[in-house]
Amino acid sequence: MTVVELPRPGRPRAVPFPDQAEAVERLVRHLHRPGTRGLFVSATGTGKTLVSIRVADGLGARLVLFVVPTLDLAAQTALAWRRDDHLEHMVIVSSLDAGGRDDLVAARVMSTTNPHALGGLMSVVGQGQDQIPALTVICTYDSLDKIEQTQRSGYEVPPFDLAVMDEAHRIAGRADKKWAIVNDAQRIRAHRRLY
């Protein structure tokens, strides 16, 4: 049996360290204008995920794409968002079956590789009565083609408010690398990109 610590009403969110708070403030200021890209460099284990979550908050992002290199990081990232009191709809796009992991089931994290299912979900993000207020999509670099297919699925899928690329050094280099499609605004549509 797996025990997962989920957000509880009244539980305080993590307080960023001063360097994290400064990074969030600077990144939000930089990324405020649609069409911008930003680079955040920090050592392993220094809280880059928390900074990214708080940047999304600071931008008021309702539709977020968070791209990671591995299945373990996909699960870890989903749980980090939940621990930071993010209760919005959340889906992992990869070969990971969230239904087969007790921690992800308890955290109410879905998974799919079906562009039409994801497109249906993404198309109802908004403030209307029949809409969901926010959606976080966590995707592995290997599954980026599913995001591209979703955005071309025929649903009225808006661009992501923010796309975050974890371990971005993996997408550097030649533009024709499979994972580099996340840099191409014609293939993966996002108003802002954070590397």
Map each language-model feature to its residues:
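Conserved helix/coil segment N-terminal to the catalytic DExD/H
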Residues: 119-159
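SF2 helicase catalytic motif II
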Residues: 142-143, 153-195
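Conserved Walker A/P-loop ATP-binding site and its immediately adjacent core
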Residues: 54, 58-98, 141-143
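Walker A/P-loop
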Residues: 33-56
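Conserved pre-motif I regulatory segment
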Residues: 2-41
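Conserved catalytic network of the ASCE P-loop NTPase/AAA+ motor domain
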Residues: 58-59, 85, 128-131, 154-157, ...
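Conserved helicase motor
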Residues: 92-121, 140-146, 170-171
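Pre-Walker A (Motif I) flank of P-loop NTPase domains
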Residues: 33-39, 61-62, 134-135
